[in-house]
Amino acid sequence: KFLLSILYFLLSIILVLALWFCFSALDKKKSIAMIPQNFHALVHTDSLYDAVNPLLDLQAADIFLSSENMSDFRGIFINLRSENIRNNKLIKVALQRKIDAALYTDSQNNASYIVCADFGFLSAITRLSRFIIPILKINGISMINENGLNYFVFNSNGNKFYFKNVKNLVILSNDFEKFKIALKADNDLTYNKEQLEILNKKTTNPIKIVINGKQVIQSFIQDNKILSLTNSIFDDSSLSIVSFGITDQKITLDFDVPV
């Protein structure tokens, strides 16, 4: 009876874990709901591993990292290039995450960003972050709870990074105001039908960049009265796609520009 009780207990734990992982895989929020309007560029990949892995073999990367000011990153790059890491099944699964990263600039050309990572079924772990991270007591990370909003802040050399899990997603930003807008989780409602079609469009290349043409042009011509006249060519809501893949043998580029 004792052994049978242990067996039932273990089966119960396995069942609870299975249900929790299934729930985490099904209870989803789309990344675009966390991306505020008016970005300069939005970088998307369906798999971080598939996007980054080919870049590790580029000969150009060796030349770039051979410079003295990149010496701090050379060791990290060599370790990442190691087959033991790249072919590790657990690492592959962990890095096969959808990533969206949106870049913004204000009127003073200060840059900010929102990064949204879709952990899928692995969000069974990230959903517990508010309980796990305080226990780990990681240096520089503090949990904030104010006005009903709880999130984490990572302080590094005077810079603050804000992050929080939302269902299957983890949101990261260096700008608190943008971070709060992202956490409303309804930003997808602010895009029109044409924009959503562009944002959700699949590409054959591993990396897709969605550009707000007017926002980018404005950042370059805002002080030039003559060039600013060309700004009217671009619709306020028009988005364009640049997707690409890079190997030593070839660079693949695709453009999708509305006219």
Which residue ranges define each predicted feature?
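Structural boundary/hinge residues at secondary-structure and domain interfaces
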Residues: 4-8, 13-140, 144-151, 197-233, ...
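Generic beta-strand structural signal
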Residues: 105, 143-146, 163-166, 173, ...
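Short solvent-exposed loop/turn micro-motifs enriched in small/polar/acidic residues
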Residues: 145, 153-157, 237
